[in-house]
Amino acid sequence: MATNVGPQIRSGELVFGVAHIFASFNDTFVHITDLTGKETIVRVTGGMKVKTDRDESSPYAAMLAAQDAAAKCKEVGITALHIKIRATGGTATKTPGPGAQAALRALARAGMRIGRIEDVTPIPTDSTRRKGGRRGRRL
């Protein structure tokens, strides 16, 4: 007897998941979970899609990762996504890497309906000392 993996729904009804896109300047993660965030459906990184280390964070690698993730979502039965974009944050950079926008566009182009888009980068309220020393990073 075959069992259905996804949720029981009527046709045409949107089933939401959450896409956690972590875009640093070294890699891009596309991690899709259920609405609670506890159950991982698929996690793909830019590094899994390209051979060279320097291309892990590229928009192309992020696009390939997002396409893979969207295909797996459709298999499971998820048709729509809320998106949480995150940069490294903390004492490091607070701007998302180059793969964030490409991953978001690829999810939309793959036929996933987009719900809410939210920036969840951790921002320090009063943090530890930032790296670089007293006189800062000298170029």
UniProtKB/Swiss-Prot annotation:
GO BP, sorted A to Z: cytoplasmic translation; ribosomal small subunit assembly; translation
Cellular localisation: Cytoplasm; Nucleus; Nucleus, Nucleolus
Principal location: cytoplasm
Region feature (Disordered): 119-139
Coiled coil: none
Transmembrane stretches, start-end: none
Alphabetized PROSITE patterns for the sequence: RIBOSOMAL_S11
Keyword Coiled coil assigned: no
InterPro entries: Ribosomal_uS11 (IPR001971), Ribosomal_uS11_CS (IPR018102), Ribosomal_uS11_sf (IPR036967)
Assigned GO CC terms: cytoplasmic stress granule; cytosolic small ribosomal subunit; nucleolus; nucleus
GO MF annotations in UniProt: structural constituent of ribosome
A Pfam family this chain is assigned to: Ribosomal_S11
Keyword field: Cytoplasm, Nucleus, Ribonucleoprotein, Ribosomal protein
Role played: Component of the ribosome, a large ribonucleoprotein complex responsible for the synthesis of proteins in the cell. The small ribosomal subunit (SSU) binds messenger RNAs (mRNAs) and translates the encoded message by selecting cognate aminoacyl-transfer RNA (tRNA) molecules. The large subunit (LSU) contains the ribosomal catalytic site termed the peptidyl transferase center (PTC), which catalyzes the formation of peptide bonds, thereby polymerizing the amino acids delivered by tRNAs into a polypeptide chain.
Annotated family: Belongs to the universal ribosomal protein uS11 family.
Miscellaneous: There are 2 genes for uS11 in S.pombe.
Protein name, as recorded: Small ribosomal subunit protein uS11B
Natural source organism: Schizosaccharomyces pombe (strain 972 / ATCC 24843) (Fission yeast)
